[in-house]
From Swiss-Prot:
Binds 2 Mg(2+) ion per subunit. Mg(2+) 1 binds at D7, D139. The RuvA-RuvB-RuvC complex processes Holliday junction (HJ) DNA during genetic recombination and DNA repair. Endonuclease that resolves HJ intermediates. Cleaves cruciform DNA by making single-stranded nicks across the HJ at symmetrical positions within the homologous arms, yielding a 5'-phosphate and a 3'-hydroxyl group; requires a central core of homology in the junction. The consensus cleavage sequence is 5'-(A/T)TT(C/G)-3'. Cleavage occurs on the 3'-side of the TT dinucleotide at the point of strand exchange. Mg(2+) 2 binds at E67. It holds the Pfam family RuvC. GO terms for biological process: DNA recombination; DNA repair. It comes from Bordetella pertussis (strain Tohama I / ATCC BAA-589 / NCTC 13251). SUPFAM superfamilies: Ribonuclease H-like. NCBIfam families: ruvC. This is Crossover junction endodeoxyribonuclease RuvC. Belongs to the RuvC family. The gene is ruvC. The active site is at D7, E67, D139.
Amino acid sequence: MRVLGIDPGLRRTGFGVIDAEGMRLRYVASGTIVVPPALALPERLKVILDNLREVARETRPDVAALEIVFLNTNPASTLLLGQARGAALCALADSALDVHEYTALQIKKAVMGTGRAAKEQVQMMVQRLLSLDGTPAPDSADALACAICHAHVGPLHDKLDRLGTAAQLGSRPRLRNGRLVG
């Protein structure tokens, strides 16, 4: 299974592609889409949309994994991040990819074993899990971690969904007191 992971952002959107065969992971590609801040919002969103379409076309993933937007203390920032996420979702839908969403906590738990890991720790673990020569850039590492999360957790969720028990086990993120919990 080839997984495209995305860490959405209006200034920088990370992407990472891995091949997963059972528990064996192989690095395919990663990068960061840097959006010029001087562009108007619609053009910035188009940069994200066009670049992610191109990544999907070139790497031909089977599925996509996207980090769920966290609730920020600044509502304007949260809305802007949501719009960047929307551009990413449109690119994935246009590429006919199934999209699976994970919280930052779920991603860190899948990669590190704990949801309290620092960004640098996630970068180092991604490097180790994918046998990379160097440490990936922060946005790329987050996207690769999202892809790794889906490679580890996604097949289990799919099996539980087929059995009809996923909702009972609480394996999908849900809202509690206005916050996402996993």
